[in-house]
Every structure is written in C-alpha cells, then in structure tokens.
Amino acid sequence: FELTIGTIDEVPVVVYPGRIHLYQGYSAAEVTSLVRHARHLGCRDIIFACATGAVTENAHVGLGILTDQINLTGRNPLIEWDGIRDVETPFVGMVDAYTPYLRTLARGVADDLGIAVDEGVYAGVLGPCFETPAEIGMMRALGVSYVGMSTVNEVIMAHALGMNVLGLTLATNESGDPDTSHESVLEVAGRYASDFERLVRGVLHLL
C-alpha cells in the first residue's frame, strides 16, 4: 500500500487507500497489519470505513455509524499474531468495541452538516459470496443492522493495541437483494463519496 501521511485541518493523519481481506487468502494477522502499522506510527484514534449490506429496516442504503459488532468470520488475529506476547493480556475486553465518545462525535458532526446517518450493529463474515436469505434472517434475529466482509478483526487488533475506534459504513445495498453485484456496490459508493468525505473531515476537525 502507498499510504499518505499529512494533516487535515491541522490534524496529523495517516491514510491507507484500501485493505486486504480474509477471502483473498490472507490470515487474520496479515489482514490487521495496517492497524499495527498505524499504532507503530503513533496513531491513538483509528477510523475504519467499510461497505456493507443493510440487514434491518432501521438501516438504509447510505451512511451509518457502527455501534457494536459480531465476529462471524471464524478468525481472530490475536491467535495468529506473534506480537501477542508483548500485549498485557490476550484476553482483550470488547465492551464498547466502537468508542462511545467517537460515535457521539460522529453523530453530532453528521447532524450539524445535515448528513443522514443510521446506527447499528455490524456483523463481519468471511465472504466472498453474498449472504443467503436464511443467513440474513439469522442476522436479523441476532440484532444485526449491517453485514460486511471486513473490519471485525481489525477492531479486535485496535483494542489489543489500546486504540480508540470509530467505525463508519456505507450501506450500498439491502442484503438479500438478488440484483446486488460488485458493480452496483461500487456505483452506490460513488454517490455517497462526498458526504462520507465531509463526515470524516468534520470528525477529524474535532479530534
């Protein structure tokens, strides 16, 4: 990755242009390597962005703030990471997986800018296939609002490293929609790119 280091509104930032995924054959330790890199550079706060499918009626196509997560990938980076021996404990607490004050901050910024955002629980799955109707039904029963193929392992790693976490999502489709394709996901993402940028800039300005 060709990362970018600079400032946004005088806030020092490190920006990574993408991520690797478990479904590409990488391990959970490899998938979370950018989180460790950011912490090594001195980052205390980290903002994760992900594309998701909206699972419930309370989550619509558009921007959302993640409030909690369910790891359905069957992986955990703390099992595979050699550096776990240097962490105080491998039994990392995941209460407030997404830092409350950052969630509140993002909600306030969205309201001030007139950007519509939903909030909800995120389920991370292995992928790369989209979910079956039965799987979506299970997630609804579990209280899931959004589903995607990333992020949950990265959040675990961030907590192990003592970082504050904000999760922002763009729900690009309603999960279970038979017309969903990779191309349609990219098309919807493009429509919301400007609002997403404004939201992130607004949050950074207040950090």
Residue ranges, per PLM feature:
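Metabolite-binding pocket within alpha/beta catalytic cores that recognizes anionic/polar moieties
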Residues: 1-94
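General beta-strand structural signal in soluble alpha/beta enzymes
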Residues: 15-17, 46-50, 65, 117-123, ...
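Non-catalytic positions within long, well-ordered alpha-helices that form the structural scaffold/packing
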Residues: 38-42, 140, 159
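Polyanion-binding loop/helix "lid" in catalytic or ligand-binding cores
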Residues: 87-98, 104, 136, 189-200
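Active-site/ligand-binding-proximal alpha/beta "capping" segment
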Residues: 103, 108-145, 200, 207
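Zn-dependent metallopeptidase/amidohydrolase metal-coordination segment
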Residues: 149-185
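His/Asp/Glu-rich mid-to-C-terminal helical/loop segments that flank catalytic regions of hydrolases
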Residues: 175-207
